[in-house]
Amino acid sequence: MIRVLALVARNTRSAVGGKPMDPISMIRPCRKIRGISAILLPFQSNGDVDWAGFTAHVRRTVAAGLAPAVNMDTGYAHLIDDATRTRALELTQAETDDFVAGAFVGDQPGETFNADEYLRQMEIIQSAGGVPVIFQSHGLTAQSEESVVASYAQLAENADAIIGFELSDVFAPFGKIYSLDVYHGLLGIERLIGSKHSSLKREFEWQRLQLRDEVRPDFCVFTGNDLAIDMVMYGSDYLLGLSTFAPDVFAKRDAAWATG
């Protein structure tokens, strides 16, 4: 498997120095992994949210040692209303003070960046003690590269910490995988403490890890690649939907990696 990955990387240029990428040299054994697991929002047969099931799942995730992520795509962030989002936050806050939550702004192509709505969503999350994960939107990603970075900086000024989220447009029409120039700019925003990467392309994530290691080692690259959960070997942490099925198993994997 490692040999196959090396062949894949041969034609991929490094994010630092432009040399061919060598992912094998990036493997980081005995590293403590930061695991965040997106919580599924379950529904009953009558269409009501199964809040008892939701709470039990949050509790199970916390007991396993992972931080829950609520109101993400696994929690139908783009389909639920503010009342449902707020209830999910309240129930999560009752179980843990270590959690993140999606800040989603629904818009249409051609609309401008809606900073006010992002800030409103962020305030709801922060009031419950969570860290906002900034979902992309048409207004955010359609801007110039300089304006994209400036928008994240504006949001970060109004929070103790935020997490970014790159989403491939194969998943959502507003999604965008940023250029490495944009990513470099994001690394310069102090209160942007990490970013989830969901391109499903190892080489893109390897490039981000290299750039992170060079520019800002404390920045978290959260893999969102459910098809390559071994990206933690190379220095990624994770914010995954797949882990919602078995948070205890992911936690055991993480512990085994940390101890070698």
Feature roles, as predicted:
Residues 8-9, 19, 54, 213-215:
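Intrinsic disorder/low-complexity signature
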Residues 1-20:
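N-terminal amphipathic/basic-hydrophobic helices that include classical n-h-c signal peptides
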